[in-house]
């Protein structure tokens, strides 16, 4: 790596060439891919909801009680703390570095689990045209090639990832616009009202809804790479909310309205390709399959960017060793990207449903901390500079966070015993990892970035944390 990489320290004054900042349009589509990527994966909501009615109502109501509150919280806190690290910095500022580290660990693990889905799903779409990919001998090398190729694209620069997200999103959404137009003559609105209460699977329904509408906060870990984040972030989040809702509702209304309600039981992952064939023919089916495959690439790129820059941000504030802050000549966090890619490869053996339930559980824990931090920072730091401020008082923001908090608790309660067990192991691992890293820092077994060379942070110094958070901060990873 030599001349291509550098690390922020007091001995090295040379820095990599600054990479171009993210502007509004690429950020909109990066957030779109963090959250959605298109209607691929929403088909299960029709099956688990017993028909179109609950699926359509879910994608109308859930954004109001979940997506919009989470987006508003993200808009205020990401602009107040415009740093790589995002929610880790928010939680540390509100509750101290111990809980900030736990938030980072849960969210990173959840994100890597989520990212492990996309190379697998990409191959699942391609195997319809290339059956050889169904065999392990071909599938494993293909999985590795895809993962390393996409990892290299991330390494080349965030602005390239942002531009790729725009191109991939346009390509992925176009076939659904065409499908909706072709479906109009055959739509019967009464079909949208069908529901078979005997076939409702509430756990599957809520997990599908939650998975397809979460991760609004992930882009906050890129805040340090955004041009004028105080103005750009709120606009990008607003645009992404509209784009996500439209990308779900329009295809669902077209497909369920144009086809008989007797097909509700057939709606599962990948069924939109069959819907396309029934509405437009084989050519539309092929287009949707290609769009689905490309969408998974966009999802992978957006998720890996957030995960890698989160590790970089945690290193910059002294939570992780300094090598996680190492940047390439393109301004990307090399070691952090490789760490996230390694996690993706190791987790790709898990099943689709297992991954969704595990990542939802860990993500839900993190969101409860974020909502609590949002309210506490309104009380604890009323004078904090907030370029964007949710126009509600403390009681109002508490009420804003109540419905989504109840929703994430419901998702956790509905989890399978296996999910509780494995998630519990991950939580205990995070609790043990924090004091271990504290010991590493005290013994100087690894170098951490000195406070005087760090970026300006919203996280308090150790003396302030001692006063604000009591004994817990005595083992702080932050000086």
From Swiss-Prot:
It comes from the Eukaryota. Residues 454-479 are annotated as: Disordered. Gene3D superfamilies: Amino acid/polyamine transporter I. It is a multi-pass membrane protein. Coiled coil: none annotated. It is found in: Cell membrane. The chain crosses the membrane at residues 22-42, 53-73, 86-106, 130-150, 160-180, 236-256, 275-295, 304-324, 332-352, 355-375, 395-415, 420-440. GO terms for biological process: polyamine transport. One of its GO terms (molecular function) is symporter activity. PANTHER family: OS12G0580400 PROTEIN (PTHR45826:SF17), POLYAMINE TRANSPORTER PUT1 (PTHR45826). Belongs to the amino acid-polyamine-organocation (APC) superfamily. Polyamine:cation symporter (PHS) (TC 2.A.3.12) family. Probable cell membrane polyamine/proton symporter involved in the polyamine uptake in cells. This is Probable polyamine transporter At3g19553. It comes from Arabidopsis thaliana.
């Amino acid at each position: 790596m030599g001349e291509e990489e550098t690390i922020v320290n007091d001995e090295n004054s040379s820095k990599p060439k600054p990479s171009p900042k993210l502007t509004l349009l690429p950020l909109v589509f990066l957030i779109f891919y963090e959250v959605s990527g298109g209607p691929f994966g929403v088909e299960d909501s029709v099956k688990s909801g017993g028909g179109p009615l609950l699926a359509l109502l879910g994608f109308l109501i859930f954004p109001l009680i979940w997506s919009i509150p989470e987006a508003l919280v993200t808009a205020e806190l990401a602009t107040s703390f415009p740093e790589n690290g995002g929610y880790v910095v928010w939680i540390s500022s509100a509750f101290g570095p111990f809980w900030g580290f736990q938030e980072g660990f849960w969210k990173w693990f959840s994100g890597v689990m989520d990212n492990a889905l996309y190379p697998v799903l990409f191959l699942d779409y391609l195997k319809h045209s290339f059956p050889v990919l169904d065999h392990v001998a071909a599938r494993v090398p293909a999985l590795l090639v895809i993962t390393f190729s996409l990892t290299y694209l991330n390494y080349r620069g965030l602005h390239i990832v942002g531009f790729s997200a725009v191109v991939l999103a346009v390509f992925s959404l176009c076939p659904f616009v065409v499908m909706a137009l072709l479906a109009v003559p055959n739509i019967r609105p009464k079909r949208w009202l069908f529901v078979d209460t005997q076939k409702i699977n509430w756990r599957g329904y809520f997990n599908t809804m939650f998975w397809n509408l979460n991760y609004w906060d992930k882009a906050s870990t890129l805040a340090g790479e955004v041009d004028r984040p105080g103005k750009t972030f709120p606009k990008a989040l607003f645009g992404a909310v509209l784009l996500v809702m439209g990308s779900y509702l329009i295809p669902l209304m077209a497909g369920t309205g144009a086809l008989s309600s007797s097909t509700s039981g057939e709606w599962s992952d990948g069924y939109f390709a069959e819907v396309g064939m029934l509405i437009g023919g084989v050519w539309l089916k092929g287009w949707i399959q290609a769009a689905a495959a490309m969408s998974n690439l966009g999802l992978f790129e957006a998720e890996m960017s957030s995960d890698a820059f989160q590790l970089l941000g945690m290193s910059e504030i002294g939570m992780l060793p300094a090598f996680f802050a190492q940047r390439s000549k393109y301004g990307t966090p090399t070691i952090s990207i490789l760490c996230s890619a390694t996690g993706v490869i190791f987790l790709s053996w898990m099943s689709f449903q297992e991954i969704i339930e595990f990542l939802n559980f860990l993500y839900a824990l993190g969101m409860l901390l974020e909502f609590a931090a949002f309210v506490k920072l309104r009380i604890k730091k009323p004078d904090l500079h907030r370029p964007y401020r949710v126009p509600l008082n403390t009681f109002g923001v508490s009420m804003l966070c109540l419905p989504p908090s109840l929703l994430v608790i419901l998702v956790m309660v509905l989890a399978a015993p296996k999910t509780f067990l494995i998630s519990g192991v991950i939580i205990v691992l995070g609790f043990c990892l924090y004091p271990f890293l504290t010991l590493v820092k005290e013994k100087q077994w690894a170098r951490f970035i000195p406070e005087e060379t760090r970026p300006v942070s919203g996280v308090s110094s150790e003396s302030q944390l001692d006063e604000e958070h009591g004994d817990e901060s005595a083992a702080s990873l932050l000086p």
